C-alpha cells in the first residue's frame, strides 16, 4: 500500500508548478558594480563595495560596527567565539531554527539548551527561556522567525540582571522594528544573512 502511494506521489510531481524561494532582481546598478569589480580585479572580500556595504548596513541596523562574512552560519560562529564564553557553559537556543545554530554552539565547546517555540509566532517562547536560565547559562541566541520579532523585553531584562550575553539572529527580520528600534540592534551581537528565505 505504501509503495503505491509513493509511486502515485512521484507521478503527480510532473503536474506541480515549481515555486522558487526567491527570485533575484538585478538592475543596471548591480550590473555596473559587478563590471567594476571585474575591471578592478577586486572580486574577493576586500573590495570597496564590501567596506561600503559593512558601513551602510551597520548604520541601517543601528549598530556601530559590521563585518561581512560568507554566510549566516559563519556569522553565528564568529559571534559566539568573539564573546569568549566559558567552555562547557550553556547557551539557550530555539528548537525551531536552522541546524547551524546548535552546530555552532557545539563547535565552540558549549552546550546548547533547546527551548520550544511559541505556537502562534514560531519564535522561541520567552517564558520557557526564563525557566531554563541557571548559573551555567552564558548566552542566549534569539532567532527571529518569519518576519516576526521575538518578544524581547523580559528576556533582555533577565539577561542583563544575570550577565548573560545575547546574540540576535536577525536574518529573517532585516528592516523590521521592535518597539521603534531596529531588530538586530538589541543583542550584544547580532547576525544577519541574505539566504533566499
Stretch-by-stretch model annotation:
Residues 1-43:
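N-terminal "arm"/small-domain region of PLP-dependent enzymes with the aminotransferase-like
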Residues 20-22, 70, 141-143, 191-195:
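Short beta-strand segments
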Residues 23, 131, 181-183:
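Short secondary-structure boundary/capping segments
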Residues 46-90, 104-108, 114-116, 181:
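Phosphate-binding glycine-rich loop
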Residues 81-161, 165-170, 177:
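PLP-dependent aminotransferase-like
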Residues 168-197:
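Conserved active-site segment immediately N-terminal to the catalytic lysine
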Amino acid at each position: 500500500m505504501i509503495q503505491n502511494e509513493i509511486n502515485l506521489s512521484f507521478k503527480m510531481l510532473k503536474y506541480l508548478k515549481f515555486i522558487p524561494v526567491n527570485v533575484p532582481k538585478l538592475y543596471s546598478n548591480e550590473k555596473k558594480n559587478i563590471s567594476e569589480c571585474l575591471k578592478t580585479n577586486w572580486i574577493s572580500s576586500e573590495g570597496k563595495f564590501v567596506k561600503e556595504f559593512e558601513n551602510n548596513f551597520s548604520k541601517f541596523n543601528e549598530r556601530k560596527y559590521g563585518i561581512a562574512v560568507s554566510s549566516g552560519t559563519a556569522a553565528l560562529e564568529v559571534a559566539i567565539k568573539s564573546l569568549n564564553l566559558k567552555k562547557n557553559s550553556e547557551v539557550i537556543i530555539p528548537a525551531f531554527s536552522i541546524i547551524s545554530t546548535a552546530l555552532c554552539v557545539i563547535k565552540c565547546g558549549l552546550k546548547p539548551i533547546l527551548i520550544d517555540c511559541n505556537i502562534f509566532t514560531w519564535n522561541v517562547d520567552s517564558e520557557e527561556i526564563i525557566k531554563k536560565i541557571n548559573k551555567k547559562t552564558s548566552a542566549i541566541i534569539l532567532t527571529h522567525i518569519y518576519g516576526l520579532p521575538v518578544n524581547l523585553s523580559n528576556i533582555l531584562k533577565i539577561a542583563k540582571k544575570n550577565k548573560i550575553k545575547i546574540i540576535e539572529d536577525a536574518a529573517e527580520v532585516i528592516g523590521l522594528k521592535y518597539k521603534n528600534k531596529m531588530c538586530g540592534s538589541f543583542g550584544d551581537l547580532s547576525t544577519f544573512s541574505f539566504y533566499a528565505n
